[in-house]
Amino acid sequence: MILDEIVAQKKIQLKKDMSRITIEGWKQKIKRPGIHKPLDFYGALKNNGDISIIAEVKKASPSKGIIKEDFDPLKIAKEYVESDIQAISVLTERNFFKGDEDYLVKIRQFCPLPILRKDFIIDLWQIYESRYIGADAILLIVSLLSDEELKKFQIVANILGMQCLVEVHDERELERALESGARIIGINNRDLRTFEVDLKNTEKLMNRIPNDRVVVSESGIKDTEDLKYLKELGVDAVLIGETFMRARSISEKIREFKAV
């Protein structure tokens, strides 16, 4: 399964990365003056008064290959900022999504919006790294973590001032996310094991989530009809990547979506 391959590669990459700096090393770096103070990701999505948009900087995916050939992460992020969306998601996974931590570092330098680090986080080391490179929130995928890890990772992220988008795909994962105390729940409409997409997954899980949580619908949002459907369901936010990456004009596509 592709998810198993991604995690296996992530473990190999992490072993190399962790050999150059320890968690203690990250802790010291985080204390340096001038390090970005995390923004309120939850507040940006919940208090918008309308459905919020998290726009993603995404070059490729395992299911689609290269999505955007003329990929300029800084230009894309600037267009997002100018389009008055609520948050930006930056893919940093290198092997399968062609992302890079450096994209986030550079976008952080000019971006006034909360930034979500989208990666496969399986070790505390990555959480400290995320804080140092400028993330305001991190993605935690429930299916990759034990109950203990899910709770501990959120606690550590919160202590560091960051928030977590806790991603689920089915009822059991949602139950685990809620039990862990997750405040921002991402419902992935894509099954990460088969890569099949069904927007109705959001509808199926939504009514099980308390009103004080932020609900984010992720994957498969292609047009204004999809957005209208999700808005009528009452989701707080949508995470959109591929649709914006394939658009002839990102800003025009966002304008269309915001008019819904």
From Swiss-Prot:
- UniProt-listed SUPFAM superfamilies: Ribulose-phoshate binding barrel
- Gene Ontology biological-process entries: L-tryptophan biosynthetic process
> What EC class does the entry list?
lyase
* Superkingdom to which the source organism belongs: Bacteria
Q: Show the Gene3D superfamilies listed in the entry.
A: Aldolase class I
Catalytic activity field: 1-(2-carboxyphenylamino)-1-deoxy-D-ribulose 5-phosphate + H(+) = (1S,2R)-1-C-(indol-3-yl)glycerol 3-phosphate + CO2 + H2O
Query: Quick one: which pathway?
Result: Amino-acid biosynthesis; L-tryptophan biosynthesis; L-tryptophan from chorismate: step 4/5
By sequence similarity, the record places it as follows: Belongs to the TrpC family.
Q: What is this protein called?
A: Indole-3-glycerol phosphate synthase
Species name: Acetivibrio thermocellus (strain ATCC 27405 / DSM 1237 / JCM 9322 / NBRC 103400 / NCIMB 10682 / NRRL B-4536 / VPI 7372) (Clostridium thermocellum)
Q: Which gene encodes it?
A: trpC
